[in-house]
A protein has these predicted regions:
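Conserved short alpha-helical segments that host acidic/polar catalytic motifs at enzyme active sites
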Residues: 1-244, 248, 263-264, 268-276, ...
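Glycine-rich phosphate-binding loops that contact phosphosugars or nucleotide phosphates
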Residues: 275-415, 446, 493-537, 556, ...
Length: 581
C-alpha cells in the first residue's frame, strides 16, 4: 500500500527516474500520485488524483538532480489532490507510507504553536512536526531521532529539507523501505524491483534507522544518532521479470510463468522438519490464507499433525493456548503484510518457533521469523496473485510430503509444467462470455476443493468486480441454495476421490434449481446431465491435483475481467502489499 521513490544524483533527471519508479510501484495500489523536486534551490510539488499518467500530464519540462515521489492509497483523508503526497510544511517536504496513530495529538500541539493544515492527513502532521523540531535544533538527524520515539504506528518517510537541497533523508518503522546504491547516484524505494533499471545494489533499512543520502554517500544512523555499518546486498533476479515482455497484462504474463515456477519449486530443497511439532498455526491474509488451507489438508492427512489456519488480522487479537511444541507458519508473498507480521511478533514474544513462507528475500517477515522458506515465484506485479499463490501451495504440499512416509509420484511431478501449459492454452473465452454479464457467481466444493473454490471466487471478484462467494458444498442445503435461480452460474470443483460422489450430488441439487453448472474435475463423468460445461483436469496423484485445479479458475477470472474492460493488473481499491493493519 502506497509506494515511495526518491533519487539524488548527477547522471539523470530525477523527475524521469521518479516517474519511472512510480510506474513500477503501481502494483502496490494507489488512488493519487505526486512528485517533489528541487529547482533553483526551491522545492516544486505536483500532485494529481488518479493514474500516474494524470500526474505526467501536468509536469513541466524541468530538470533536477534530486526528488521524491509517491503513490497514495487513502487511509487518513479522502483521495483528493489536497491529501495526495508529497506534503510540504515550512522547509520540510516528505512522502510517507504507513499510519501515524497519534497524529491527532501531535496536530493539536502543533496548532497551538501556530501551524495550520491544508489536508486531513497524518502525513502533513508529520512534516510539520519535523519542521518544528528542525527549527529548534537545526539538525535533521537529531530531529528524526526524536520522531522515532514520538511517532506511534508505522511509517516509511522520504524527506527533502529545502535548506539542504543535495540531501535525501529517510526513516522507517514497520513499513518497507530500501536504499538503492548506484555510482554517483543513490535511491530510496519501497522495494527493489522499482529501481532495477538503474541498480541491483541495495541496503535493507531496519526499524528505527535513519538515513542521510547524497549522490556520493549513504550514512545510516540508529535512533540514538550513532552511525552504523550496513551491508550492501545484490539483487540476483532477472530484471526482465518486472516487465510485461510482450504480454497484454502482467497477470497474463505471470500465469504463463507458472509452469517454470512449479519446475523451480519442485526442484528446490525443502528440508524443514515439522514432525517435531505437536501443533501448527498457519497465519495469513487473502490468497495466502487460502494457500494455508491447502497446507492444512495436506499436513494433517500426510503428517498427522493438527493444523489451525487463522486469518492474521483476527489471530493477533485471540488468546493463544500454545500446547506442547507449536510452530507458527506465516505466509506472505511480499513478506511485508502488516497483520501477518504482527502475528509473528506475538509468537516470537511467547518463544514459539516461527517459519516464514515468503516470496521476497530480505523482507520483514523473512527477517523476523526464526526459520524461512522462500517461494520461487520471482517478482509478481499484478495485484491479484497467481504464480505466487501457486508457489505457496506447491511449497506447502512438498513440505507435507517430505515430512511424511508418502512418496510423491515423480513422473507426475515432472509432468506438472507440461500439464500446466496444456491448461493455460485452453480457450476459456466462450465460458467467460456467458459469465461476464452475471450479477452473482458461486463456487462449491468439499475438503481441499473448498479451499480452491475460495481462491477461485476471490480471484473472480478481485478483478471482475462480480459478486462471488465460495461455499462448502455440504452447506448448500442449509441456506445457500435459496440464492440459486434459473441461470445462476455455479462452479463445482470435484477432484477429491473420497468426496467426489457427495459433491456431484450437491451439483445435482443446484442444477435442479436452475443453476448453470460448470464442473471442474479430473474424473470421468458418466452422467453428463450433471453439468452444463465441463473443465477437465489432467489426472495426477492426489497430492498434486490442487496445483492443476486452480489454473482454469485463474484464467476464467482473467477472461471475464477482460470482457468487462477492467484494469486487470490494478483492480480498484486494492493494494498488492498491505503494509498497514
Amino acid at each position: 500500500m502506497c509506494g515511495i521513490i526518491g533519487y539524488v544524483g548527477e547522471k539523470r533527471c530525477s523527475i524521469d527516474v521518479i516517474i519511472d519508479g512510480l510506474k513500477h510501484l503501481e502494483y502496490r495500489g494507489y488512488d493519487s500520485a505526486g512528485i517533489a523536486y528541487v529547482k533553483d534551490n526551491n522545492v516544486v510539488i505536483e500532485r494529481e488524483v488518479g493514474r500516474i499518467s494524470n500526474l505526467e500530464s501536468v509536469l513541466k519540462k524541468d530538470t533536477s538532480h534530486i526528488g521524491i515521489g509517491h503513490t497514495r492509497w487513502a487511509t487518513h483523508g479522502k483521495p483528493t489532490k489536497e491529501n495526495a503526497h508529497p506534503h510540504k510544511v515550512g522547509n520540510i517536504t516528505l512522502v510517507h507510507n504507513g499510519i501515524i496513530d497519534n497524529f491527532m495529538e501531535l496536530k493539536s500541539t502543533l496548532m497551538s504553536e501556530g501551524y495550520t493544515f491544508k489536508s486531513d492527513t497524518d502525513t502533513e502532521v508529520a512534516a510539520a512536526y519535523i519542521d518544528s523540531l528542525y527549527k529548534e535544533n537545526n539538525d535533521m538527524i537529531k530531529s528524526l531521532s526524536i520522531c522515532v520515539n514520538k511517532f506511534l504506528g508505522s511509517y516509511a518517510f522520504g524527506i527533502i529539507n529545502e535548506l539542504e537541497t543535495d540531501v535525501l533523508y529517510a526513516l522507517r518503522k514497520d513499513s518497507p523501505l530500501i536504499i538503492g546504491v548506484g555510482e554517483n547516484e543513490n535511491f530510496i524505494a519501497s522495494d527493489v524491483p522499482s529501481i532495477l533499471k538503474y541498480t541491483n545494489k541495495y541496503i535493507d533499512i531496519e526499524n528505527d534507522e535513519i538515513v542521510k543520502i547524497t549522490k556520493d554517500e549513504v550514512t545510516v544512523y540508529d535512533k540514538n544518532c550513532n552511525i552504523i555499518n550496513k551491508e550492501i546486498s545484490v539483487f540476483e533476479g532477472d530484471a526482465n521479470l518486472v516487465e510485461k515482455n510482450g504480454y497484454e497484462t502482467y497477470m497474463l504474463k505471470e500465469i504463463h510463468e507458472e509452469a517454470e515456477v512449479i519446475k523451480k519449486t519442485s526442484e528446490a530443497s525443502i528440508d524443514f522438519d515439522i514432525t517435531k511439532y505437536d501443533e501448527i498455526d498457519i497465519v495469513a491474509c487473502g490468497s495466502a490464507y487460502h494457500a494455508g488451507l491447502v497446507g492444512k489438508y495436506m499436513i494433517e492427512k500426510l503428517c498427522n499433525i493438527k493444523v489451525n489456519v487463522c486469518i492474521a488480522s483476527e489471530y493477533q487479537y485471540d488468546k493463544h493456548f500454545y500446547k506442547g511444541k507449536t510452530l507458527v507458519i506465516a505466509i506472505s508473498q511480499s513478506g511485508e503484510t502488516a497483520d501477518t507480521k504482527k502475528c509473528v511478533n506475538i509468537a516470537n514474544d511467547m518463544d514459539v518457533d516461527t517459519l516464514g513462507i515468503v516470496n521476497v528475500k530480505g523482507s520483514s517477515i523473512a527477517r523476523i521469523c526464526k526459520h524461512v522458506i522462500y517461494t520461487l515465484a520471482g517478482p509478481e506485479i499484478a495485484v491479484a496473485t497467481t504464480k505466487a499463490y501457486l508457489a505457496q501451495i506447491t511449497t506447502l504440499i512438498l513440505l507435507a510430503v517430505k515430512n511424511s512416509k508418502e512418496k510423491i509420484n515423480t513422473e507426475d511431478l515432472q509432468k506438472l509444467p507440461y500439464y500446466i501449459e496444456t491448461l493455460i492454452n485452453k480457450d476459456y473465452t466462450s465460458l467467460a462470455n456467458m459469465l461476464h454479464t452475471k450479477d452473482d457467481i458461486y463456487f462449491i466444493g468439499r475438503g481441499i476443493d473448498y479451499a480452491l473454490c475460495m481462491e477461485g471466487s476471490l480471484k473472480l471478484k478481485e478483478i471482475s468486480y462480480i459478486h462471488s462467494e465460495a461455499y462448502a458444498a455440504g452447506e448448500l442445503k442449509h441456506g445457500t441454495i435459496s440464492l440459486i435461480s434459473e441461470g445462476t452460474p455455479v462452479i463445482v470443483v470435484a477432484t477429491s476421490d473420497e468426496l467426489y460422489l457427495k459433491t456431484i450430488s450437491n451439483a445435482k441439487e443446484a442444477k435442479a434449481r436452475g443453476a448453470y453448472v460448470i464442473l471442474v474435475t479430473d474424473k470421468e463423468v458418466i452422467n453428463e446431465g450433471v453439468y452444463d460445461e465441463l473443465i477437465s483436469i489432467p489426472k495426477v496423484t492426489e497430492e498434486l491435483r490442487p496445483i492443476l485445479t486452480i489454473i482454469p479458475l485463474q484464467l476464467i477470472s482473467y477472461e471475464v475481467a477482460k470482457l468487462k474492460g477492467n484494469d486487470i493488473d490494478k483492480p480498484k481499491n486494492l493494494a498488492k502489499s498491505v503494509t498497514v493493519e
